[in-house]
Protein backbone atom coordinates (compact mmCIF):
# COMPACT_ATOMS: atom_id res chain seq x y z
CA UNK A 1 0.00 0.00 0.00
CA UNK A 2 2.83 2.44 0.72
CA UNK A 3 3.79 2.32 -2.97
CA UNK A 4 0.35 3.41 -4.16
CA UNK A 5 0.00 5.94 -1.33
CA UNK A 6 3.29 7.61 -2.36
CA UNK A 7 2.15 7.81 -5.98
CA UNK A 8 -1.15 9.28 -4.83
CA UNK A 9 0.58 11.98 -2.76
CA UNK A 10 2.72 13.00 -5.73
CA UNK A 11 -0.27 13.70 -8.01
CA UNK A 12 -2.02 17.07 -7.99
CA UNK A 13 -5.67 16.91 -6.91
CA UNK A 14 -6.91 18.20 -10.30
CA UNK A 15 -4.90 15.53 -12.13
CA UNK A 16 -6.09 12.87 -9.71
CA UNK A 17 -9.72 13.82 -10.37
CA UNK A 18 -9.05 13.51 -14.10
CA UNK A 19 -7.44 10.07 -13.69
CA UNK A 20 -10.30 8.81 -11.50
CA UNK A 21 -12.79 10.11 -14.09
CA UNK A 22 -10.87 8.52 -16.99
CA UNK A 23 -10.94 5.20 -15.14
CA UNK A 24 -14.65 5.65 -14.35
CA UNK A 25 -13.62 4.45 -10.90
CA UNK A 26 -16.75 3.81 -8.85
CA UNK A 27 -18.55 6.96 -7.75
CA UNK A 28 -15.43 9.05 -8.65
CA UNK A 29 -15.77 10.98 -5.36
CA UNK A 30 -12.41 11.91 -3.84
CA UNK A 31 -13.75 14.76 -1.72
CA UNK A 32 -13.24 12.90 1.57
CA UNK A 33 -10.13 12.79 3.70
CA UNK A 34 -6.63 12.39 2.29
CA UNK A 35 -7.34 8.65 2.54
CA UNK A 36 -10.48 9.02 0.38
CA UNK A 37 -10.21 5.39 -0.78
CA UNK A 38 -10.24 3.93 2.73
CA UNK A 39 -13.72 4.01 4.29
CA UNK A 40 -14.30 7.54 3.02
CA UNK A 41 -15.92 9.21 0.01
CA UNK A 42 -14.67 6.98 -2.83
CA UNK A 43 -16.86 3.90 -3.30
CA UNK A 44 -16.60 1.09 -5.86
CA UNK A 45 -18.39 -2.24 -6.15
CA UNK A 46 -16.78 -5.62 -6.78
CA UNK A 47 -18.39 -5.69 -10.25
CA UNK A 48 -16.96 -2.24 -11.07
CA UNK A 49 -13.52 -3.42 -9.92
CA UNK A 50 -13.68 -6.44 -12.24
CA UNK A 51 -14.85 -4.26 -15.16
CA UNK A 52 -11.86 -1.98 -14.56
CA UNK A 53 -9.46 -4.95 -14.66
CA UNK A 54 -11.03 -6.01 -17.95
CA UNK A 55 -10.62 -2.49 -19.40
CA UNK A 56 -6.96 -2.50 -18.37
CA UNK A 57 -6.35 -5.89 -19.99
CA UNK A 58 -8.24 -4.97 -23.16
CA UNK A 59 -6.32 -1.68 -23.47
CA UNK A 60 -9.51 0.38 -23.34
CA UNK A 61 -7.91 3.14 -21.28
CA UNK A 62 -5.91 6.10 -22.54
CA UNK A 63 -2.91 5.36 -20.34
CA UNK A 64 0.54 4.57 -21.68
CA UNK A 65 1.09 0.82 -21.99
CA UNK A 66 4.34 1.13 -20.01
CA UNK A 67 2.40 2.54 -17.04
CA UNK A 68 -0.23 -0.19 -17.31
CA UNK A 69 2.51 -2.83 -17.35
CA UNK A 70 4.23 -1.21 -14.35
CA UNK A 71 1.00 -1.38 -12.34
CA UNK A 72 0.40 -4.98 -13.40
CA UNK A 73 3.97 -5.88 -12.43
CA UNK A 74 3.51 -4.22 -9.04
CA UNK A 75 0.46 -6.36 -8.25
CA UNK A 76 1.83 -9.62 -9.66
CA UNK A 77 1.73 -12.11 -6.81
CA UNK A 78 3.08 -15.13 -8.65
CA UNK A 79 4.48 -16.05 -12.04
CA UNK A 80 4.52 -19.77 -12.75
CA UNK A 81 5.06 -21.76 -15.92
CA UNK A 82 1.34 -22.20 -16.45
CA UNK A 83 -0.11 -18.94 -15.15
CA UNK A 84 0.39 -15.40 -13.86
CA UNK A 85 -1.50 -14.38 -10.73
CA UNK A 86 -2.21 -10.69 -10.08
CA UNK A 87 -4.12 -9.24 -7.16
CA UNK A 88 -4.60 -6.43 -4.66
CA UNK A 89 -6.09 -6.52 -1.18
CA UNK A 90 -7.80 -3.79 0.78
CA UNK A 91 -9.02 -3.55 4.36
CA UNK A 92 -11.35 -0.89 5.71
CA UNK A 93 -10.95 -0.17 9.39
CA UNK A 94 -13.53 1.69 11.47
CA UNK A 95 -12.90 2.32 15.16
CA UNK A 96 -10.00 -0.12 15.09
CA UNK A 97 -12.07 -2.98 13.64
CA UNK A 98 -11.64 -4.57 10.22
CA UNK A 99 -15.12 -4.07 8.79
CA UNK A 100 -14.53 -4.23 5.05
CA UNK A 101 -12.15 -6.59 3.26
CA UNK A 102 -11.68 -7.11 -0.44
CA UNK A 103 -9.38 -8.79 -2.91
CA UNK A 104 -9.47 -8.31 -6.67
CA UNK A 105 -7.32 -9.89 -9.31
CA UNK A 106 -6.71 -11.79 -12.48
CA UNK A 107 -5.34 -15.17 -13.40
CA UNK A 108 -3.70 -15.21 -16.84
CA UNK A 109 -3.55 -18.79 -18.07
CA UNK A 110 -3.34 -20.40 -21.51
CA UNK A 111 -3.95 -17.08 -23.28
CA UNK A 112 -7.09 -16.29 -21.28
CA UNK A 113 -7.74 -13.96 -18.37
CA UNK A 114 -9.96 -14.89 -15.45
CA UNK A 115 -11.10 -11.93 -13.35
CA UNK A 116 -12.40 -12.08 -9.81
CA UNK A 117 -13.34 -9.96 -6.82
CA UNK A 118 -14.10 -11.04 -3.28
CA UNK A 119 -15.69 -8.63 -0.82
CA UNK A 120 -16.26 -9.26 2.89
CA UNK A 121 -18.39 -7.04 5.08
CA UNK A 122 -18.67 -7.49 8.82
CA UNK A 123 -18.37 -6.02 12.28
CA UNK A 124 -14.80 -7.28 12.75
CA UNK A 125 -12.20 -9.51 11.08
CA UNK A 126 -13.37 -8.70 7.54
CA UNK A 127 -9.87 -8.19 6.17
CA UNK A 128 -8.30 -8.14 2.73
CA UNK A 129 -6.18 -11.12 3.80
CA UNK A 130 -9.31 -13.16 4.54
CA UNK A 131 -10.80 -12.15 1.18
CA UNK A 132 -7.55 -13.22 -0.51
CA UNK A 133 -7.55 -16.57 1.29
CA UNK A 134 -11.14 -17.23 0.19
CA UNK A 135 -10.33 -16.21 -3.40
CA UNK A 136 -7.30 -18.49 -3.54
CA UNK A 137 -9.27 -21.45 -2.24
CA UNK A 138 -11.88 -20.95 -4.97
CA UNK A 139 -9.23 -20.43 -7.68
CA UNK A 140 -7.47 -23.62 -6.57
CA UNK A 141 -10.77 -25.55 -6.62
CA UNK A 142 -11.30 -24.28 -10.17
CA UNK A 143 -7.77 -25.50 -11.00
CA UNK A 144 -6.70 -22.06 -12.20
CA UNK A 145 -3.63 -21.95 -9.96
CA UNK A 146 -2.00 -25.12 -11.27
Please tell me what each predicted stretch does:
Residues 4-58:
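Mid-domain, small-residue-enriched loop/turn segments at the edges of structured enzyme/sensor domains
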Residues 9-12, 54-146:
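Structured C-terminal helix/loop/strand segments within mature extracytoplasmic catalytic/sensor domains
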